[in-house]
């Protein structure tokens, strides 16, 4: 019947163990950031767009801690051994992202970025907001945060001409490494949500706080950065003339990071959405070689080691 067809079409998918992605490694990177070599215009020579990524780096460490804590809490409830192993890998990758971004943030602080102010803002949002949420809502928020990083990762991989012509090799390295791994584990948090909850209303409830934080709050913070670092920008014709271009780089509908990704962003609201509906397999294989090749890879100078967590059986 029509009713049954519609019910099937809009009923959230269940977690399917057999359809999980491959297991993923945890990679250690060492990038020796120095304040004097950080380029505040590393992203296409745009001060505003670059400030967004610098601000995102500061807030990301708090988001990653939420993901780690939430994943660790829910891991013990999983009955699928492979999913449990993948959650362990997710925790490992996110812990290293947080560590290296914190090193970048310390260098940004020395370079007169308002790091301490933004840390205080992030601590307020997380300590008095997100971290006080009940665990089911945290699980939903974790899945939503991972969705937005997956959107950013796919954009980066689809626009090689942008991210491989950065004005700062070290900032390019951290973002390319981070986004490679975000794409690798983009479905893990969602699979955990599917397995333990799969409640559509709860999933949507987690989407909007993530949306507001990543696209509104962090962007508002980014607008403050160029004025804080260089107060004369307030009366600089050249700076204000560059602002629309910076805005277009982030939110332009044709090539903007988020503006051109709006279909991917809002696909999350479809009841039968799954992260792997957006297939990045070919991109991942290409970038693993492009970034990690021992001789010519972009990340080779920063690579330390990698390992894959062991698969352990879940007690019945």
Show the residue positions of the predicted features.
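Non-heme di-metal
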Residues: 6, 10, 17-316
């Amino acid at each position: 019947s029509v009713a049954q067809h519609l019910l099937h079409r809009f009923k959230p998918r269940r977690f399917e163990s057999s359809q999980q992605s491959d297991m993923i490694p945890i990679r250690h990177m060492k990038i020796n950031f120095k304040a004097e070599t950080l380029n505040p215009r590393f992203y296409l020579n745009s001060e505003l767009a670059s400030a967004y990524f610098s601000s995102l780096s500061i807030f990301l460490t708090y988001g990653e801690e939420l993901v780690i804590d939430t994943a660790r809490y829910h891991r013990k409830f999983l009955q699928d051994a492979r999913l449990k192993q993948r959650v362990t890998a997710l925790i490992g990758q996110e812990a290293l992202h947080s560590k290296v971004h914190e090193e970048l943030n310390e260098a940004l602080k020395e370079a007169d970025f308002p790091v301490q102010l933004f840390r205080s803002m992030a601590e307020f949002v997380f300590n008095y907001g997100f971290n006080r949420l009940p665990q089911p809502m945290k699980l939903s928020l974790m899945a939503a945060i991972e969705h937005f990083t997956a959107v950013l990762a796919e954009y980066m991989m689809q626009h090689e001409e942008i991210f491989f012509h950065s004005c700062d090799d070290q900032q390019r390295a951290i973002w390319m490494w981070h986004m490679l791994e975000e794409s690798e584990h983009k479905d893990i948090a969602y699979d955990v949500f599917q397995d333990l909850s799969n409640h559509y209303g709860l999933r949507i409830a987690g989407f909007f706080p993530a949306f507001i934080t990543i696209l509104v709050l962090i962007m508002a913070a980014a607008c403050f950065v160029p004025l804080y670092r260089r107060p004369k920008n307030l009366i600089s014709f050249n700076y204000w003339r560059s602002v629309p271009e910076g805005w277009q780089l982030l939110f332009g509908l044709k090539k903007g990071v988020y503006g051109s990704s709006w279909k991917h962003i809002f696909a999350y609201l479809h009841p039968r959405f799954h992260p792997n509906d957006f297939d990045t397999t070919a991109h991942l294989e290409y970038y693993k070689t492009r970034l990690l090749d021992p001789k010519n890879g972009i990340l080779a100078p920063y690579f330390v080691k990698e390992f894959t967590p062991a698969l352990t059986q879940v007690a019945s």
